From Swiss-Prot:
UniProt PTM: Three different forms of TVIIA exist. Pro-10 and Pro-11 of conotoxin TVIIA are hydroxylated in TVIIA, whereas Pro-10 is not hydroxylated in [Pro10]TVIIA and neither Pro-10 nor Pro-11 are hydroxylated in [Pro10,11]TVIIA.
InterPro entries according to UniProt: Conotoxin_TVIIAGS
Name of the protein: Conotoxin TVIIA
Database matches in SUPFAM superfamilies: omega toxin-like (SSF57059)
Molecular-function annotations in GO: sodium channel inhibitor activity; toxin activity
Keyword Secreted tagged: yes
Expression by tissue: Expressed by the venom duct.
Positions bearing 4-hydroxyproline: P10, P11
Primary subcellular site in the record, as a coarse category: secreted
GO CC annotations on file: extracellular region
Disulfide bonding pattern of the chain: C2-C14, C9-C19, C13-C24
Length: 30
């Protein structure tokens, strides 16, 4: 699942990324 997903983020954020403020960010904090 996508942690923090919102409508501004593409579905690819679900794959190893999460959504933060409309942008995809690494779940590892990079």
């Amino acid at each position: 699942s996508c942690s923090g997903r919102d409508s501004r983020c593409p579905p690819v954020c679900c794959m190893g990324l999460m959504c933060s403020r409309g942008k995809c960010v690494s779940i590892y904090g990079e």
